Amino acid sequence: GRVELLARPAIGLVGARNASANGCGFARKLSHSLCDAGYVVVSGMARGIDGAVHEAALKADPNAHGGTIAVLGGGVDVIYPREHRDLYGKLCEQGCVISEMPPGLQPQARHFPRRNRIISGLSYGTVVIEAGRNSGSLITARFAGEQGRDVFAVPGSPTDPRAAGPNSLIRDGAILCDSADVILDALRDATQNTHLFEDFHQFNTNARSPEVNSDPARYDDIAQSIVQDAENSGSKEPSQSIEIDSELGDLSPTDTDADQSGKVLDLLSTTPLLIDDLIRASELPANSISSILIELELAGRVERHPGNRVSRIAK
């Protein structure tokens, strides 16, 4: 890909794989705005938030000198998830794809904390958009803090499990992020004097600071400590499984009715969403969405609202 992107000012955007449509929409908005402001956005090419971030960045104004970098958990030539094959191709042409793993190596759960460390290390700040209490995105946030980077979190409804991670980060001192302006204002002092803005095309791997411990085993220990903290928190919500372990849980996804219902439910949050937007986000036929919503409504999982909107019912 375009290796010169590695020398440009970057911001990491990470979040849930089972992100809601509203969460993905906000991720796209942030990504597009940051790229238009001249930043490179960095993410992990996973489902959900990551994919939305990369897709929006690729559509941003090319004259703004933004761009996007995908950090993979396997070899740089291994496409995961499989449905991101087209996105991978576009990233190789218009963005940059990197990995510290050898070519051909299939992704494994233990690789993802190391990938997350690279995402935060490349970035002046890391933004978490929707993440469960046990999400692997919180590993990226912790790495960012240890590396001296800013940590931003997008707040969410306390009734949505996917807001537990960002809300917790905000309580712990992360910067509340409700627009790209918050990020740009916070990072302006950090970037206004750097030579990175003066010569976008000079590849300089020494531009990032501060220096951090690069011992891979250390990052495995950090990841394990986060997992342990999550287990001790007493959260038993099925959707809150540790995402660094579940990244590989569906290499061969099926398309059964149960899978489609789960996909629709994952896209919904307690904030009402237009059914038309749900159809676009799910990429399912309108008649299938209609049937699924009826089933979920009868099961007490979703609620309809005026204006052809629907929301998930909090448990």
Where on the chain are the PLM-derived regions?
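Glycine-biased, small-residue-rich flexible motifs in mid-sequence functional cores and linkers
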Residues: 1-315
